UniProtKB/Swiss-Prot annotation:
Entry GO CC: chloroplast
Catalytic activity entry: 2 (2R)-3-phosphoglycerate + 2 H(+) = D-ribulose 1,5-bisphosphate + CO2 + H2O; D-ribulose 1,5-bisphosphate + O2 = 2-phosphoglycolate + (2R)-3-phosphoglycerate + 2 H(+)
Residues under site feature: Transition state stabilizer: 324
Organism: Apium graveolens (Celery)
Compartments in which it is found: Plastid, Chloroplast
Positions where N6,N6,N6-trimethyllysine occurs in the chain: 4
Any GO molecular function: magnesium ion binding
Something else known: The basic functional RuBisCO is composed of a large chain homodimer in a 'head-to-tail' conformation. In form I RuBisCO this homodimer is arranged in a barrel-like tetramer with the small subunits forming a tetrameric 'cap' on each end of the 'barrel'.
Processing after translation: The disulfide bond which can form in the large chain dimeric partners within the hexadecamer appears to be associated with oxidative stress and protein turnover.
Protein's gene: rbcL
Name assigned to this protein: Ribulose bisphosphate carboxylase large chain
């Protein structure tokens, strides 16, 4: 017999500390927690093997191909400071292992099987370096930040949004009315909640028609371009496309998709349609916490964000730093920059394990949403800068006088912060003062400040 069968020691073939990574390799950083007694090199090598060419035993067909050319390699292991049994394993994958333009295939290869590995207690994909050669096979976001600003004719400030609540139970006519009030009051966008698809109490077509009416009425009265994220997410790709096509026929500017529950394949199809037909695409990340919340197992959100930029979306929800959902400031800013910028330097303090060059892939606007209100406005404009969408759901609709005054309060607070910044004031330290001054000439803002002055989500 020409080779020895039986379970093999992955370390022999797949741990290659001397390997020099190529510009075309896809690089991954895994946080691996091996079972007691399993050395980290063996665990890292096992991850490299099973997510590329390896199987658990030597097979006859290994002789029919060139493993040296196609195998994943674990080229570095570093201990995690302050944690006993955990290491960061760096793995390089040859580009030929992946289908062009398919986020789906990339994930199936890299995270498809290895997360159930017996030798590991837990495994987390912390970051991916997507090589330029692979980036170039993706269309990416349908339009990107600059084109969106040009379409909306809104410059030099963050955009304002609002999720219509109660998320489930309104009839289409009342839903459209809520949309109109918010847009009329001064918001740029309103949003379907992620779980509003087409339920018995409000079918999608009725909602689309009433929302389109609300958009056009508000546009005519304010002289500003308005939008409502019409959620096209559906049970089948065909139905999703049908909804997107109907939105285009109504002439509205933007549709929305839940990219994790809807799936990357559906999302990429929708993104291509949106670019071909001039629709902006708002992406919601429902289900992300299932994947990214555990510190030692799963996939970090920065990887899901990179994947979305490749698959395509013009906005994506990315945490708030200040509201009700968790997210540490530096880490959040790390993936916010990954979404917006062309080139991001490796910076471990922000959780960025690799330098990422996006070449000319358009950027994505980060959306801050979840438990934020007018008092957060200075912090949000300071943290996220101009290229962002700030979304106040309850922070608009919870206004004691109703939706339109709630929208007015948010718009006034935003404009006050932008003006203060232009005047050179420090938003971080003078934030509360800036908002207080603005309340003097805006009764709507004064009422909002009164309602939310005590609320904090602290756990």
């Amino acid at each position: 017999v020409g080779f020895k069968a039986g379970x093999k020691d992955y370390k022999l073939t797949x741990x290659t500390p001397e390997y020099e990574t190529k510009d075309t390799d896809i690089l991954a950083a895994f946080r691996x927690s091996p079972q007691p007694g399993v050395p980290p090199e063996e665990a890292g090598a096992a991850v490299a093997a099973x997510s590329s060419t390896g199987t658990w035993t030597t097979v006859w067909t290994d002789g029919x191909t060139s493993l040296x050319r196609y195998k994943g390699r674990c080229y570095g292991i570093e201990p995690v400071v302050g944690e006993e049994n955990x290491x960061i394993x760096y793995v390089x994958y040859p580009l030929d292992l992946f289908e062009e333009g398919s986020v789906t295939n990339m994930f199936t290869s890299i995270v498809g099987n290895v997360f159930g590995f017996k030798a590991l207690r837990a495994l987390r994909l912390e970051d991916l370096r997507i090589p330029v050669a692979y980036v170039k096979t993706f269309q990416g976001p349908p339009h990107g930040i600059q084109v969106e600003r040009d379409k909306l004719n809104k410059y030099g400030r963050p955009l304002l949004g609002c999720t219509i609540k109660p998320k489930l139970g309104l009839s289409a006519x009342n839903y459209g009315r809520a949309v109109y009030e918010c847009l009329r009051g001064g918001l740029d966008f309103t949003k379907d909640d992620e779980n509003v698809n087409s339920q018995p109490f409000m079918r999608w077509r009725d909602r689309f028609l009433f929302c389109a009416e609300a958009i056009y009425k508000a546009q005519a009265e304010t002289g500003e371009i308005k939008g409502h994220y019409l959620n096209a997410t559906a049970g089948t790709c065909e139905e999703m496309m049908k909804r997107a096509i109907f939105a285009r026929e109504l002439g509205v500017p933007i549709v929305m998709h839940d990219y994790l529950t809807g799936g990357f394949t559906a999302n990429t199809s929708l993104a291509h349609y949106c670019r071909d037909n001039g629709l902006l695409l708002h992406i919601h990340r429902a289900m992300h916490a299932v994947i990214d919340r555990q510190k030692n197992h799963g996939i970090h959100f920065r990887v899901l964000a990179k994947a979305l930029r490749m698959s395509g979306g013009d906005h994506i929800h990315s945490g708030t730093v200040v509201g009700k959902l968790e997210g540490e400031r530096d880490i959040t800013l790390g993936f916010v920059d990954l979404l917006r910028d062309d080139f991001i330097e490796k910076d471990r303090s922000r959780g960025i394990y690799f330098t990422q060059d996006w070449v000319s892939l358009p950027g994505v606007l980060p959306v801050a949403s979840g438990g934020i209100h007018v008092w957060h406005m200075p912090a949000l404009t300071e943290i996220f800068g101009d290229d962002s969408v700030l979304q106040f759901g309850g922070g608009t609709l919870g206004h004691p006088w109703g939706n339109a005054p709630g929208a007015v309060a948010n718009r006034v607070a935003l404009e006050a912060c932008v003006q203060a910044r232009i005047e050179g004031r420090d938003l971080a330290s003078e934030g509360n003062e800036i908002i207080r001054e603005a309340t003097k000439w805006s009764p709507e803002l004064a009422a909002a400040c009164e309602v939310w002055k005590e609320i904090k989500f602290e756990f």
